[in-house]
Amino acid sequence: MTAAVLDCFASLAMTAHDLTPDLAARFAGIALGHVTREYPHKLDQVLDGPEDLLSPRELHPIFFGSFDWHSCVHGWWLMLRLRRLFPELAAAARIEALADEMLAPAKVAGELDYLDRAYSGGFERPYGWAWLLALHAEAQRHPDRPWAEDLEPLARAFAGRFQTYLPKLTYPIRVGTHFNTAFAMILALEWAEPNDPLLADLIRDRARDYYGQDRRCQAWEPGGDEFLSSALTEALCMRRTQGDEAFRGWFAGFLPDLASRAPPSLFAPATVADRSDGKIAHLDGLNLSRAWCWRSFAPALEPELADLARKTADEHLAASLPHVAGDYMGEHWLATFAVLALEA
C-alpha cells in the first residue's frame, strides 16, 4: 500500500466507525491486490505422492491468492459485498470483470476436483467451508451475474461436509482460531436458512447442545495467536441460532457480570506486538471480530448493556482498524473482519 493510503488508515482511530464509500474503496483496492497474488502462499494439503506437489494455482484454479485458500475465499466475499453495497464504487467494474473470469464453471470444477483427492476430508474444516458458504450466499444477492449458479456445486459440497461433520463432533472446538465451531456455524446458518433447511435445523440443534448449559464464562482470553473471541463468538452464535428471547435468558447466565465490566478481558483491546508476525497479527483480527460480536448482539440487550457493548466495540475498532493495511500478514485478510464489524 502507498504511504498516503496507510496515512488514511492511521486516521481511522479518530473517526466514526461506519462503513463509508471511502472505506469501501480502500478495502476493495486491498482485496483486488491480493486475491490473484499467488505468492507467498501457505497450502493446506496432505501429500499422497510426489505428483501432488503442484503450485497453488494448479491446485486451486480460483482460490490460489491471498496467502491461503480461506483468505482468498473471503477476499472474494468482501469484493462482492462491496460491489453490492456500493454499486457506484470505482472498483466495481474491475470486481465484475475479475469475477466473470474467475467464478466460472470450469474453474469451479477444478476446485471440486481438489475435494476428491485422498485425505481431503479435513481440508479447510470448518473455517474455509463456512466462508465458501458465505461467499455463495453473497453471490446470490447479485442476480445480474451467474456467479451464484456457478458456485452452487461447490457450496453444496461443503454443505454436505457440514451435514456429516457436525453430528460426529461430540464437543465444540472453542479455540479462537480457524477451528472454532461457533464461528463456522454463524456463517453456515446464514447460507443454510434459505438454501438447506435441514442443515439450518442441525446447526441450531448443535449450538444448543454445545453451548446451551454454559454458565459464568471466565473468558480466559485472548490466546497469543487468536483472532476470534471464544466467549463472544459463542454468544453471537447463540443469538443467531436460538433467537433473541432465548438468547437473553441464556446470556444473563453466561456473562452475568457484564454491567460491572467483567470479565475484564473482554473489554480490553488486545495489544499487537509485531504485525509482521502472521500469528501475532491475528490479534488485530481479534479486536475487529470482538467489535463485530459486541455490535451484533447489542440490539438484543437492555439499553444500558447495549450502550456498553457499542462503546466497547468502538474501542476495539479504534485499536485495530488503522492497521488493516501495512503488512501482508494482516493485509491479506483483515479487511474482511473490518467490514463485518463496521457493517454490524
Regions of interest found by a model, annotated:
Residues F267, T271-A344:
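Fungal-biased detection of long, low-complexity, Ser/Thr-
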